[in-house]
């Protein structure tokens, strides 16, 4: 019996090293199932040098990982410190040898093994200048490991952020995938979107036509709990918020027919202990129940105020049993009933356009605004001199990872659908960019819905700024877990209005006379809607606009037909004209 067992083990080890052409490829859906729950070997090869951030890799780690019950290991790797800065951008052979040794340790234990490019921020800092070097690095990685089994998975780039744009990320994914496919035609490759692999950015991810792709996102929300040790976690609303995010990702995955890998998630060691265990348990369960694979982040660091995020002690070879159990077992620390499925909001008839303007805030009454900030950023607000009488003065000091903002607590839960624009007077101590943010209402009490923003470049003298609501874009650096995922700015459910940070700079802002702007009053009954220019707005205009939408060669007055003044003539204008004629 012992001989048979030894033979089986030997065969499995040999098969893990067989090249893909011999062993056979595995499609991405099956690969994600095979990956199951895994862990990261963090702070090892993603450090400037191995051992500078955490203990160097040891073969026994993989024995311990396997005994614990993990199915895959993600090995983050920083390549730039081991690559020539100039052409031909050769990767140090000794470093490649070391990486191959560790990959083989992992593969020989039967792990699906993920390697990536990690902390290579030089590419993000100047994409157009550095993409050539990045291509050469991946060409060497792909060539070196082309003979490994299908259990080796490539991940192109960890957490794109900073200067790199969505279009550049999509271009990079296509370029690197083409390079990989020259030597690894069927190997599974993981691609991700921007803003630190945010789930919010998945909608911006262009998916190449390739059957062996896996999409990734990372999850550390709520950040104030997982990284800043603030408060506790584990209420019904806390869990519902995470479930909404994973539902959102699952819908995106199904729509785009691509499986999903939650490549990182974790909580710093100084967070509330009971909450941390419960958070690991719930997030792991949500990932698996949605059909994702997931890899918990572990960096081997214990006791550090800034970097403690580990559950495996590399010296004692002991796991934090509570965290390990929470990650690998289902629902042992929490009770949760999924929220009742709610139907999406029914189709709405567009509101009848408003005319003129409505002043909503002149700062002449009691103070209704409040400041908020965190992570070394600060903000305060007070009533001060405005453009006309009183105004709001905002003093802020940003930080590289911090946030600040001021929120209007009076005008919450508003319906602004009939308005076209928002207007305000603004003056700044400098020309630093700030953002105007409108948060939608949410179906979860106490939570925001989707965030929509517009970047303001204020002057140092009083200026009136008018912003069409159609110019707002979905916030990409963060979205509340309770967002509805509609990708539509729903003005009929405005939750709150904010002025907030756009970068880490500091300064002072003065705000006055916030207004909602409708159609020009001189156009009432005159031009807007008079599609045939006969001086009347009637059923003839309605019929003519309908014909135009079916055949754009028909002659109409396009200025008058653009009912909502967004520059396009479409079904929204048709619906708004109908409401005008009905007098609603």
Curated annotation (Swiss-Prot):
<dbReference type="InterPro" id="IPR008979">
    <property type="entry name" value="Galactose-bd-like_sf"/>
</dbReference>
<feature type="domain" description="CBM11">
    <location>
        <begin position="354"/>
        <end position="584"/>
    </location>
</feature>
<dbReference type="Pfam" id="PF00150">
    <property type="entry name" value="Cellulase"/>
</dbReference>
<dbReference type="GO" id="GO:0009986">
    <property type="term" value="C:cell surface"/>
</dbReference>
<keyword id="KW-0326">Glycosidase</keyword>
<dbReference type="InterPro" id="IPR017853">
    <property type="entry name" value="Glycoside_hydrolase_SF"/>
</dbReference>
<keyword id="KW-0119">Carbohydrate metabolism</keyword>
<dbReference type="InterPro" id="IPR002105">
    <property type="entry name" value="Dockerin_1_rpt"/>
</dbReference>
<comment type="similarity">
    <text>Belongs to the glycosyl hydrolase 5 (cellulase A) family.</text>
</comment>
<comment type="pathway">
    <text>Glycan metabolism; cellulose degradation.</text>
</comment>
<feature type="active site" description="Proton donor">
    <location>
        <position position="159"/>
    </location>
</feature>
<keyword id="KW-0136">Cellulose degradation</keyword>
<dbReference type="InterPro" id="IPR036439">
    <property type="entry name" value="Dockerin_dom_sf"/>
</dbReference>
<dbReference type="InterPro" id="IPR050386">
    <property type="entry name" value="Glycosyl_hydrolase_5"/>
</dbReference>
<feature type="region of interest" description="Catalytic">
    <location>
        <begin position="25"/>
        <end position="328"/>
    </location>
</feature>
<keyword id="KW-0624">Polysaccharide degradation</keyword>
<dbReference type="Pfam" id="PF03425">
    <property type="entry name" value="CBM_11"/>
</dbReference>
<dbReference type="GO" id="GO:0008422">
    <property type="term" value="F:beta-glucosidase activity"/>
</dbReference>
<dbReference type="InterPro" id="IPR018087">
    <property type="entry name" value="Glyco_hydro_5_CS"/>
</dbReference>
<keyword id="KW-0732">Signal</keyword>
<dbReference type="GO" id="GO:0008810">
    <property type="term" value="F:cellulase activity"/>
</dbReference>
<protein>
    <recommendedName>
        <fullName>Endoglucanase D</fullName>
        <ecNumber>3.2.1.4</ecNumber>
    </recommendedName>
</protein>
<feature type="active site" description="Nucleophile">
    <location>
        <position position="264"/>
    </location>
</feature>
<feature type="domain" description="Dockerin">
    <location>
        <begin position="524"/>
        <end position="584"/>
    </location>
</feature>
<dbReference type="Pfam" id="PF00404">
    <property type="entry name" value="Dockerin_1"/>
</dbReference>
<dbReference type="GO" id="GO:0005576">
    <property type="term" value="C:extracellular region"/>
</dbReference>
<dbReference type="GO" id="GO:0030245">
    <property type="term" value="P:cellulose catabolic process"/>
</dbReference>
<keyword id="KW-0378">Hydrolase</keyword>
<dbReference type="InterPro" id="IPR001547">
    <property type="entry name" value="Glyco_hydro_5"/>
</dbReference>
<dbReference type="InterPro" id="IPR018247">
    <property type="entry name" value="EF_Hand_1_Ca_BS"/>
</dbReference>
<comment type="function">
    <text>The biological conversion of cellulose to glucose generally requires three types of hydrolytic enzymes: (1) Endoglucanases which cut internal beta-1,4-glucosidic bonds; (2) Exocellobiohydrolases that cut the disaccharide cellobiose from the non-reducing end of the cellulose polymer chain; (3) Beta-1,4-glucosidases which hydrolyze the cellobiose and other short cello-oligosaccharides to glucose.</text>
</comment>
<dbReference type="InterPro" id="IPR005087">
    <property type="entry name" value="CBM11"/>
</dbReference>
<dbReference type="InterPro" id="IPR016134">
    <property type="entry name" value="Dockerin_dom"/>
</dbReference>
<feature type="signal peptide">
    <location>
        <begin position="1"/>
        <end position="24"/>
    </location>
</feature>
């Amino acid at each position: 019996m012992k001989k048979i067992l030894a033979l089986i083990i030997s065969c499995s080890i040999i098969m893990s090293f067989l090249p893909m052409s011999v062993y056979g490829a595995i499609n991405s859906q099956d690969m994600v199932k095979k990956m199951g729950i895994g862990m990261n070997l963090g702070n090892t090869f993603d450090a400037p040098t191995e051992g500078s951030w955490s203990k160097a890799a040891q073969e026994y780690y993989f024995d311990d990982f396997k005994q614990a019950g993990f199915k895959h290991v993600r090995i983050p790797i920083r390549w730039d410190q081991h690559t020539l800065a100039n052409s031909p951008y050769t990767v140090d052979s000794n470093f490649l040898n070391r990486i191959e040794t560790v990959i083989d340790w992992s593969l020989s234990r039967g792990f699906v093994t993920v390697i990536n490019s990690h902390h290579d921020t030089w590419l993000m800092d100047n994409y157009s200048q550095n993409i050539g070097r990045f291509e050469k690095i991946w060409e060497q990685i792909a060539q070196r490991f082309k003979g490994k089994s299908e259990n080796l998975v490539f991940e192109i780039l960890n957490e794109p952020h900073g200067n790199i744009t969505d279009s550049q990320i999509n271009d990079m994914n296509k370029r690197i995938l083409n390079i990989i496919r020259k030597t690894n035609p069927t190997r599974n490759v993981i691609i991700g979107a921007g803003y630190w692999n945010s789930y919010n950015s998945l909608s911006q991810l262009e998916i190449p036509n390739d059957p062996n792709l896996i999409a990734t996102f990372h999850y550390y929300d709520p950040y104030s709990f997982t990284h800043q040790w603030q408060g506790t976690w584990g209420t019904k609303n806390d869990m519902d918020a995470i479930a909404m995010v994973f539902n959102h990702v699952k819908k995106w995955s199904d729509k785009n027919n691509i499986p999903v890998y939650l490549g990182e998630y974790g909580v710093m060691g100084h967070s509330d202990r009971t909450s941390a265990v419960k958070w690991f348990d719930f997030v792991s369960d949500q990932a698996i129940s949605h059909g994702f694979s997931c890899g918990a982040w572990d960096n081997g660091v214990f006791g550090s105020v800034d970097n403690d995020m580990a559950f495996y002690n590399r010296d004692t070879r002991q796991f934090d049993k509570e965290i390990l159990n929470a990650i690998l077992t289902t629902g042992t620390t929490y009770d949760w009933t999924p929220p009742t499925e709610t139907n999406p909001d029914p189709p709405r008839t567009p509101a009848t356009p408003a005319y003129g303007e409505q002043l909503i805030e002149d700062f002449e009454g009691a103070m209704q605004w409040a400041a908020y900030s965190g992570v070394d950023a600060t903000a305060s607000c007070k009533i001060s001199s405005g453009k006309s009488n009183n105004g709001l003065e905002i003093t802020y000091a940003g930080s590289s990872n911090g946030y600040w903002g001021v929120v209007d607590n009076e005008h919450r839960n508003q319906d602004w659908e009939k308005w076209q624009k928002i207007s305000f007077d603004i003056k700044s101590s400098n020309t630093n960019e700030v953002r105007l943010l409108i948060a939608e209402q949410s179906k979860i009490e106490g939570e925001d819905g989707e965030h929509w923003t517009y970047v303001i470049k204020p002057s140092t003298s009083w200026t009136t700024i008018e912003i069409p609501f159609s110019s707002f874009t979905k916030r990409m650096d963060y979205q509340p877990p309770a967002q509805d995922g509609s990708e539509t700015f729903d003005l009929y459910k405005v939750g709150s209005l904010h002025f907030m940070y756009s970068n880490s700079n500091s300064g002072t802002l003065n705000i006055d006379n916030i207004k909602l702007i409708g159609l020009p009053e001189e156009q009432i009954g005159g031009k807007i809607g008079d599609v045939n220019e006969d001086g009347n707005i009637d059923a003839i205009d309605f019929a003519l606009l309908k014909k135009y939408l079916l055949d754009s060669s028909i002659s109409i007055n396009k200025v008058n037909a653009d009912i909502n003044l967004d520059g396009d003539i479409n079904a929204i204008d048709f619906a708004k004209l109908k409401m005008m004629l009905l007098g609603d």
